[in-house]
């Protein structure tokens, strides 16, 4: 299942706030505790990949 909903994140390479669709989203959690969802994004300006937190209601996709 592909990710389709754009998320507002801060691009660490440029420092700008951008709205991007994540390439992949996964759950990152310690054993037995509620974790966070992390998304993999590609910077539109530099082409570098970075990870950022996505909202908890965002579906896990690859």
Curated annotation (Swiss-Prot):
Reported modifications of this chain: Methylated at multiple sites, to varying extents.
Keyword DNA-binding: yes
Keyword terms of this UniProt record: Chromosome, Cytoplasm, DNA-binding, Methylation
Classification via InterPro entries: Cren7_sf, dsDNA-bd_Cren7
Keyword Cytoplasm attributed: yes
Domain of life per record: Archaea
Main location: cytoplasm
Family statement drawn from the similarity comment of this UniProt entry: Belongs to the Cren7 family.
Name of the protein in its database record: Chromatin protein Cren7 2
Organism: Hyperthermus butylicus (strain DSM 5456 / JCM 9403 / PLM1-5)
């Amino acid at each position: 299942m592909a990710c389709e909903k754009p998320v507002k994140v801060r691009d660490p390479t440029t420092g700008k706030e951008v709205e991007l669709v994540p390439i992949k989203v996964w759950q990152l959690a310690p054993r037995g505790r509620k974790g966070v969802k992390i998304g993999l994004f590609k910077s539109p300006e530099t082409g570098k990949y970075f990870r950022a937190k996505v909202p908890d209601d965002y579906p896990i996709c690859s």
